[in-house]
């Protein structure tokens, strides 16, 4: 199964200032990877499925989706967590970030860097999550500001420079060089999530398209043609696969940073190496209510594997909880699986003591990720 091949798993999220198009981006990625019907994406805003959210038009709960993307003849599993885009949801954002290894920072081409852009970059780097950049709403530069191709390039350059100024201030030392975003290196893409197109320098080289052609499509408002010539999902999912770390690589440097236990302990070693046969270690990012299955704990499995019937301990609680079902996400749908293994974003029912931030393990003595506050 693909979800056991750690080198082919990417756990990523999207983060942005409010209304810069993060949810539209997530939806159209999911849809592009073949999970939604064509006309609904964009209008339907698949990730914001709580009514409360749609009413406010902002993402409150980090929703999840898993997608399969083929790249150079190899299949990759991309687990996407939609991080809350609103500063009021700070605790949730930090937890969602902790479950990720890479993040797409979304910046509106017209508005540029905003206060919240800085906040989400800081949160990502604090959890050792590697950033790439997507400059969104590029069509608005022509529609509203009549920007020339040269001006457009300058604007992109300015946004990239500003993002890097924020990254360099907060990036962990060992990644100072590698984690700067760079159009030449393929860690920057630009486009319109709403109109379903994107491009990047590697993509243009691969498809033999130049920026002038892309600009002409925009100027003539040939949105459909542009989405066919430069599909959003292909450009971004390629960037995710090539430029963001796989689960096994990331856990080596992230676990010692985000976990408070001794990395020499067995469970520490098991997490650092994302071992499917070690004790299970599961960090809950949120608990969702399912009309059929009751409470479902969603989060990142850093070590071990979990199946129905397993006895699990919620840190700080005296009694074991018995697992009722395990699975993964496709959009708002939870797909039941026989077992779930280390390195994935998973959903588990039956953990009645779990709450957002809980650490859950088959090992009763495991040091939790977060301090337990009573």
Residue ranges and their predicted role:
Residues 1-374:
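Structural and coupling elements of P-loop NTPases
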């Amino acid at each position: 199964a693909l979800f056991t091949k750690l080198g082919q798993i990417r756990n990523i999220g999207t983060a942005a200032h409010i209304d810069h198009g993060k949810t539209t981006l997530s939806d159209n990625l999911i849809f592009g990877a073949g999970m939604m019907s064509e006309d609904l994406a964009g209008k339907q805003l698949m990730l914001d499925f709580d009514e409360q959210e749609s009413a406010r038009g902002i993402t409150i709960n980090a929703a999840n989706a898993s997608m399969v993307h083929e790249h150079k003849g190899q299949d990759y599993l991309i687990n996407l967590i939609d991080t809350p885009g609103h500063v009021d949801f700070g605790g949730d954002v930090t937890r969602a970030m902790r479950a990720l290894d890479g993040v797409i920072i979304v910046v509106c081409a017209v508005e540029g860097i905003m206060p919240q852009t800085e906040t989400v970059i800081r949160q990502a780097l604090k959890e050792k999550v590697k950033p790439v950049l997507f400059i969104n709403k590029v069509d608005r530069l022509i529609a509203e500001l009549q920007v020339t191709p040269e001006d457009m390039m300058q604007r992109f350059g300015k946004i990239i420079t500003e993002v890097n100024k924020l990254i360099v201030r907060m990036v962990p030392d060992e990644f100072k060089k590698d984690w700067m975003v760079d159009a030449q290196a393929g860690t920057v893409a630009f486009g319109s999530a709403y109109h379903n197109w994107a491009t990047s320098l590697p993509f243009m080289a691969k498809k033999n398209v130049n920026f002038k052609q892309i600009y002409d499509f925009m100027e003539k408002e040939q949105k459909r043609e542009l989405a066919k010539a430069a599909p959003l999902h292909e450009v971004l999912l390629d960037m995710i696969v090539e430029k963001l770390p796989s689960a096994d690589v990331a856990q080596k440097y992230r676990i010692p940073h985000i976990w408070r236990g001794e990395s020499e302990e067995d469970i520490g070693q098991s997490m650092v190496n994302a071992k499917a046969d070690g004790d299970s270690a599961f960090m809950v990012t949120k608990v969702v209510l399912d009309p059929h299955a009751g409470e479902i704990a969603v989060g990142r499995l850093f070590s071990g594997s979990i199946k129905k019937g397993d006895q699990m301990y919620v840190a700080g609680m005296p009694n074991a909880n018995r697992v009722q079902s395990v699975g993964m996400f496709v959009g708002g749908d939870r797909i039941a699986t026989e077992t779930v293994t280390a390195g994935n974003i998973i959903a588990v029912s039956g953990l009645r003591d779990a709450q957002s931030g809980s650490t859950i393990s088959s090992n009763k003595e495991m040091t939790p990720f977060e301090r337990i506050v009573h």
